[in-house]
Amino acid sequence: MLILNGFSSATLALITPPFLPKGGKALSQSGPDGLASITLPLPISAERGFAPALALHYSSGGGNGPFGVGWSCATMSIARSTSHGVPQYNDSDEFLGPDGEVLVQTLSTGDAPNPVTCFAYGDVSFPQSYTVTRYQPRTESSFYRLEYWVGNSNGDDFWLLHDSNGILHLLGKTAAARLSDPQAASHTAQWLVEESVTPAGEHIYYSYLAENGDNVDLNGNEAGRDRSAMRYLSKVQYGNATPAADLYLWTSATPAVQWLFTLVFDYGERGVDPQVPPAFTAQNSWLARQDPFSLYNYGFEIRLHRLCRQVLMFHHFPDELGEADTLVSRLLLEYDENPILTQLCAARTLAYEGDGYRRAPVNNMMPPPPPPPMMGGNSSRPKSKWAIVEESKQIQALRYYSAQGYSVINKYLRGDDYPETQAKETLLSRDYLSTNEPSDEEFKNAMSVYINDIAEGLSSLPETDHRVVYRGLKLDKPALSDVLKEYTTIGNIIIDKAFMSTSPDKAWINDTILNIYLEKGHKGRILGDVAHFKGEAEMLFPPNTKLKIESIVNCGSQDFASQLSKLRLSDDATADTNRIKRIINMRVLNS
């Protein structure tokens, strides 16, 4: 929790502390495109509800950029399509909307001609006329109104997006928010969002920096390049103290507004020492990256020399905080830099008190993501320096058991027939065997070590305070008559030789439902993130768990309907509750 001394109660009512990234995140499972992904939130104060929706996104199919390979922080933009080659920068080009969908010109009618000529927007008059052409996505899903404005005097062009929720977005109004050919300013490839305003007069203003030659060795292959095309997100200002219905950029290129919040993207201008709080105003020129690269897909060079080193959240409440610019949160980004390819390897969140005191950091050290495919087979890319959060061998064994090893292991423990070849392959792949043709003693020892690792991984998980769990069994088979008798004798103590799977949330339908009551100190553990089937909320017990039969309620008895109604049945319960023949109440014995 962020604590800022000196806030007035009125100010506190307006501010929500920044949402800090959580540690221990993992790459998501690959979707239908086979790509892994992860999202890292930025330290953005929520204001009164209208704040920038920005985050760092990783995709294993992503290219290089200001956050290293695979990472991006995309703002709303409209771009010329390059799917059919280099744009011609005329009416033959296709435009891509903010969602990546191809835009088509809206049909012109007598009541709604398209295009039209405009001299004003609302009460704001312009010094020149604009030709305004309406566009819409080829496949409609967002239901926004999109207008392309082209100046009839100076040729400046920008986009205006009317969102379905009433918010107005202005993209590329000034040259600072347009990615254009330095040798032909009218050849604009991308228009970046520059300002947004809600119907209530709340604004967000985006500032960008153009690439230059600061701290770049301009000799060798860097000589003679025009590197001014690239735009880097620099600041996002929001929380205007005085509401305003109209866009500020209609009348001014740099709005002189009292902003309460500023999100700063720093490229090394303010220093990256975690012990020194950065200043709001840049102190130095930005740093140059070791692996500069260029893009040419728009027909001109877009050269990138920068890495975003940190993201800073500032509050501007001079009366309450005693200073004009107060740093409250900081996302410090660390890279594995080298001349071949730079990777983001760690992210640390630091929060600050009102007096500049730095609170304990929140570290996000993540395993290395799968790198994008490299052309030409093997790469000379140096070994990654990602700060890897190692999983113990015991947790790895437990995770594999949950995913696919449970069947073989439990059959082996119960003395049932099991696929021996599959068991050997599992032990070999998990490095418990060194050969696929072990002796009987080698196989037995390897299985013993593997099972012990699973049990140790289980015991390392946190204890829980659950008092009842459920389990479904299928006992109404002639071959299981002895087992059924064992389970239906009150006072019997059952010893399950295998790992026993239960759930505190649901009882899965079978002919026998076990209500298993727990005492403090039991050895069952919720698998949580280790579980493969997370929807089951599985609680697993180690082998040789003892269960004492306390009571049995058979179908048709007076108490059966009452007990059945109290069960937390699984989703398929409504379809086939009459499969349940008995409910057995039992208790786990800890000794």
UniProtKB/Swiss-Prot annotation:
Asked whether the keyword Iron is assigned, the reply is no
List the GO terms this entry assigns under cellular component, sorted alphabetically: cytoplasm; extracellular region
Instruction: Enumerate the UniProt keywords alphabetically.
Output: Glycosyltransferase, NAD, NADP, Nucleotide-binding, Nucleotidyltransferase, Plasmid, Secreted, Toxin, Transferase, Virulence
Query: What are the protein's GO molecular function terms?
Result: NAD+-protein-arginine ADP-ribosyltransferase activity; nucleotide binding; nucleotidyltransferase activity; toxin activity
UniProt similarity note: Belongs to the SpvB family.
Query: What does the record give as the function of this protein?
Result: Mono-ADP-ribosylates eukaryotic muscle and non-muscle actin on 'Arg-177'. ADP-ribosylation prevents the polymerization of G-actin to F-actin, causing actin filament depolymerization, destruction of the cytoskeleton and cytotoxicity. Does not possess NAD(+)-glycohydrolase activity, unlike most mART enzymes.
- Protein name, per record: Mono(ADP-ribosyl)transferase SpvB
